[in-house]
Regions:
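Extended, composition-driven regions rather than compact fold-specific motifs
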Residues: 1-337
Length: 337
């Protein structure tokens, strides 16, 4: 199972293997997994209880997935009690508007917006219940997995970025890329397009995807990463240096982004008719700037899987220290997950 763990998580974390010992390191924490006899010994280290709960759930879900039909027993030293998820917050849609022709923004109300007001975790899992049904929210199971409602109560889950937060009004904005993937159902885009004031949903998080701890940032991504890039740009302080490279469909998708950093620049790349995930514009644009990076520049990129892999390979090839880079898969062409 160690081989499956390494193969799967390489797109989501830094993976290190030394014989029967594997370390997974990401923005939300670290997992140390060792094979001892016929068992796996797992130790998790995260900065917050919410991130620990999220990491435990992710590890548990994947271990059961890798086990398939084989029996698996998973026990934790601090066995979680079956109960409502501690990091779940219900939200209600307040309004919807088009930011650009292909980007739609939902403003939602939430009673505990303050816990999302952090630069350490910009992302959440959006839980979208079936329309017309009273939501049944998931619970924590004793083995660490999340117990999801099934059948007619099944919930669609997708990752999104909190675009902005209004603590006084207890409201948050979430941006949705509006697209159709060759006729495949896209639950997130569908929710963004059809949500009406009063509609209910929920958020799990905040979790992975914090702002890098650096004063010099090279940020790159396609439109799926634009909300995260925009949030980081707007969180910047005056002494920072930021250059952003953003791939979008065309000029109509460009957005005006405010930044307090005195040294700020942005480069828009247009696909001009090419399908998302096929233009391959980001990797060469990043490569063109590698020789001019400062000694403390952190390179952050997020996009379609194949390009994220190409960017990661190019950064490693350039000799950039792994602690100064992050290239993340945000989506996979041909998949709706």
């Amino acid at each position: 199972m160690l081989a499956e763990i390494c193969e799967h998580f390489v797109d989501h974390a830094e993976v290190f293997r030394d014989g029967d010992h594997v370390t997974l390191s990401s923005e939300i924490g670290e997992a140390y997994i060792s094979k001892v006899s016929e068992q796996l010994d797992i130790t998790l280290a995260c900065s917050t209880e919410d991130m620990l709960s999220m990491t435990r759930g992710i590890i548990a879900e994947h271990l059961f997935m890798f086990a398939g039909d084989d029996p698996l027993t998973l026990e934790w030293a601090d066995q979680p009690k079956p109960e409502k998820l501690a990091n779940l917050s219900e939200i209600t849609v307040v309004s919807a508007e088009n930011v650009t022709p292909r980007m739609r923004r939902l403003t939602v109300s939430c009673t505990d917006t303050a816990r999302f007001d952090t630069s350490e975790g910009l992302h959440v899992r959006l839980l979208m219940p079936p329309k017309g049904r009273e939501p049944i929210w998931p619970v924590t199971l004793a083995d660490g997995r999340i117990g999801w409602p099934e059948g007619e109560d099944e919930i669609a889950v997708r990752y999104y970025t909190i675009r902005s937060i209004d603590l006084e009004r207890r409201e948050m904005a979430i941006d949705f890329v509006v697209h159709d993937d060759c006729g495949r159902r896209m639950p997130g885009a569908e929710f963004g397009l059809t949500a009406q004031p009063g509609d209910r949903a929920a958020l799990l998080g905040p979790g992975a995807g914090g702002m890098p701890d650096a004063r010099d940032l090279l940020l790159a991504g396609d439109e799926t990463a634009l909300p995260a890039i925009a949030r980081m740009i707007e969180l910047a302080t005056p002494e920072m240096k930021i250059h952003a490279i953003i791939e979008v469909a065309d000029k109509a998708e460009e957005q005006a982004l405010a930044c307090a950093a005195k040294d700020f620049s942005i480069e828009w790349l247009h696909r001009n008719g090419a399908e998302p995930g096929t233009a391959k514009l980001l990797e060469p644009a990043i490569a063109a700037r590698l020789e001019t990076l400062g000694p403390e520049t952190f390179v952050w990129a997020a996009c379609e899987k194949t390009e994220a892999q190409a960017i990661r390979a190019r950064l490693k090839e350039s000799g950039l220290d792994r602690t100064r880079m992050s290239s993340i898969t945000y989506w996979r062409r041909g998949h709706t997950d």
